[in-house]
Amino acid sequence: MKYHYIQMLRTTFKYSISSIRLFCNNRVLQNESRAVSDLLFNLPTYNPATHRKSGNNSPHKNRDKHRHRNGNKDQRNKKLVFRWNSGTEKQQAAANSVLEEILAINSKGNIKAINPETSKLEEANIRNFLKGVNLEINGIAMVSIDNAASGDVRLPIVKEVPTRQALKNYSDKLSKIKEEELIKLGVNIKKTGRRSPDSKADSSWKSIKVSWQISDYDLKKQKCSEIVSNLEKGSKIALFINDKDSSNLSPIDEEELEAMQESSISKKEMKRREEVLEKLNEIISEYSSQITQEGLINQRIIMKVTPNLVNTNNGVDKKALKEQRKRERQEKLQRRIEKKKTSDSTE
């Protein structure tokens, strides 16, 4: 608009130049007319390119576009980026997918990782944890979330898994995203011959109840044996962690979750429940890299655990699994025989 306005003025003045020059020749007004003629013959020329360039050179323009104020200091929003030195493009994509989930939960990258030497959970940072990961051999997985930390801080529980398992987890995640997109578009998944994981019958999960009041001995022996045996068989398990007297095995809905947030427990009870959760995570993380958790520690928690894939290329693992099942059948048969002998002797 400014360009057209200037051009119009210049055209108007162009036809008036002759008259103005005659006016300027007048001796009386010679001094005054020189200023007018200088103004007319030195009008600035409008250059769109120069105008745009000068407009973008403002030192303060968009200065705070990617900043936020913190007191008197400006801080840039930083995004953690890890450069991998190993693995294929797909292996790196799978690891980056898990990394995004971790940072979404804890933006500083603080995690809890399983120490391979002690088999215990220890606090660490994802930057240091990833330095020792060779993606050609192992991938990473977020097996659970530690909600017991003080305040609003949540620590993802991370472990290394075989690269084959990491790639399967990534593939399952992409499939689930695709199915959700199809559902939003109104596509019936049943017609495509596929079914959402959430639509599977509850009977596909083995329900195991765990009490907050369970003793350390029962947790390490009886309950640990029950959990491990099911995972080794390839069964998916759902751990219902609740009070001893509760028999609630129903899913947790939004209303119940809101009610949980309003309840509270003592510090002593909170500490005990944290110990139970930590020991359960130590047990299941060795056999699974797909763990979902819902609920709150002050009421009840449901942990759904999908076992890792059995390496079919390893004959030793298949043989060991067969031997274990054989021993279980023999032990079961022996118990039946002893029970029958006891009943016969009493008669």
UniProtKB/Swiss-Prot annotation:
The keyword Cytoplasm does not apply. InterPro entries: AIM23. This is Altered inheritance of mitochondria protein 23, mitochondrial. It comes from the Eukaryota. The gene is AIM23. Keywords: Mitochondrion, Transit peptide. One of its GO terms (cellular component) is mitochondrion. Residues 50-70 have a biased composition (Basic residues). Belongs to the AIM23 family. It is found in: Mitochondrion. Pfam families: mIF3 (PF14877). Residues 47-78, 317-347 are annotated as: Disordered.
